[in-house]
């Protein structure tokens, strides 16, 4: 940057005349070090610049259309183009069935991925056992339960290929399919035209958003449940500036200390002393959200993908089991990425909204995940769907406005009770 800019001091605190990068202390003219506070500002700007450059001219790939009339699933192509420089593309879900039927996927990688899943993705409990399900449900599951993983792994490979392309397909003679859609973010409709008879995309969504798969560490793919475009954009923004996994959650319930004590017999304490918000998506969240990774000091963290180690990957896999989907609302079956975030770590909650007459609005709430006592967790968890991934969130409060208390944070959250994102806290 250019020093001086009209300032009369020898080495002014401002380090550039183009950006507001003010250092805290005036330096000597011959001091060529970059102060820590200025370095952090430069890095923040650089991360934002890289994110903006990376998304430009790429695409949001809608696989399917609007899910159950959800407002966030209405893809506004104009907003995407004008504000983010990305295109909107649509691919019908039937394309997945075409590629499975004809075999348009890397068969060698399929065998590798399936073997990895069988070795590392342990199955959880099956809540369908013992139920007397009506014919409308039993007749709807056309993929046999013992073939679910095979179908799901193929679907995952195919969706990834649709988004990014795959040169292996070109070698197989499928040139157009090998090109992909130049995606930077995407989403899958699923409900209900797909999930009423085929395995859901919970595994696909969870593993794509994670910082690893059967090939080892990888950049996470922002990939929205129910093709919730607004949440997909929030996932994209958070991942591009942090390099970490976007965790898709529904903002389900605010639990006051009083309500918690009445229902569970215990009052929360620690970071949850003022109450907490139950974050739980309908079966799919990046495995990084388990909080199983640890840094050099032993703190539980969500790491950028380039810092993920074999030990981190194993820890996330061990913290997660895969429960069969409830056939009463996922008739086609599937597997949910079930975990309980037992870490207490700083995170950022993020929501992208589109407000009529105003335009795009971004909501941000910093806070912590909470590790609640078993007596509290088990009681509340069973009130929803215990096969889904659960996180307890405690926002950082200011005593004013939307951050007056925990209830205010949830009450002011856009389009709730739908979704939010979690990332490592800060910029």
Residue ranges and their predicted role:
Residues 1-427:
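An N-terminal assembly and electron-transfer interface module characteristic of large anaerobic redox
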């Amino acid at each position: 940057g250019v020093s001086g800019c009209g300032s009369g001091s020898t080495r002014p605190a401002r380090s550039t005349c183009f950006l507001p990068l003010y250092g805290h202390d005036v330096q000597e003219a011959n001091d060529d070090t970059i102060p820590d506070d200025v370095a952090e500002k430069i890095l923040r700007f650089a991360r934002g610049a890289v994110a903006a450059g990376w998304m430009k001219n790429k695409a949001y790939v809608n696989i399917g259309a609007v899910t159950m009339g959800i407002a966030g699933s209405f893809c506004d192509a104009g907003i995407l183009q004008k504000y983010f420089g990305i295109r909107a593309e649509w691919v019908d879900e039937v394309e997945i069935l075409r590629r499975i039927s004809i075999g348009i996927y890397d068969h060698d990688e399929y065998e590798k991925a399936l073997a990895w899943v069988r070795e590392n993705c342990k199955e959880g409990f099956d809540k369908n056992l013992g139920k007397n399900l009506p014919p409308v449900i039993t007749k709807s599951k056309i993929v046999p339960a013992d073939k679910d993983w095979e179908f799901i792994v193929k679907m995952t490979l195919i969706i990834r290929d649709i988004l990014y392309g795959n040169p292996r397909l070109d070698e197989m003679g499928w040139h157009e399919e090998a090109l992909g859609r130049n995606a930077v973010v995407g989403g899958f409709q699923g409900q209900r035209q797909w999930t009423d008879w085929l395995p859901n995309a919970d595994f696909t969504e969870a593993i794509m958003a994670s910082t690893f798969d059967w090939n080892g560490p990888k950049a996470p793919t922002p990939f929205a449940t129910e093709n919730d475009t607004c949440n997909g954009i929030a996932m994209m923004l958070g991942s591009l500036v942090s390099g970490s996994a976007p965790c898709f959650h529904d903002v389900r319930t605010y639990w006051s200390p009083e309500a918690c004590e009445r229902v569970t017999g215990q009052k929360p304490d620690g970071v949850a002393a003022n109450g907490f918000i139950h974050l739980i998506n309908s079966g799919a969240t990046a495995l990084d959200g388990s909080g199983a990774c640890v840094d050099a000091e032993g703190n539980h963290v969500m790491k950028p993908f380039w810092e993920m180690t074999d030990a981190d990957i194993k820890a996330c896999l061990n913290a997660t089991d895969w429960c069969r989907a409830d056939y009463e609302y996922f008739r086609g079956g599937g597997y949910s990425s079930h975990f309980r975030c037992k870490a207490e770590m700083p995170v950022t909650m993020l929501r992208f909204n589109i407000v009529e007459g105003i335009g795009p609005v971004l909501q941000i709430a910093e806070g912590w995940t909470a590790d609640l006592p078993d007596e509290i967790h088990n009681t509340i968890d069973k009130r929803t769907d215990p096969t889904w991934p659960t996180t307890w969130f405690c926002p950082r409060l200011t005593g004013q406005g939307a951050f007056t208390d925990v209830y205010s944070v949830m009450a002011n959250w856009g389009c709730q009770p739908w979704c939010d994102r979690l990332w490592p806290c800060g910029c």
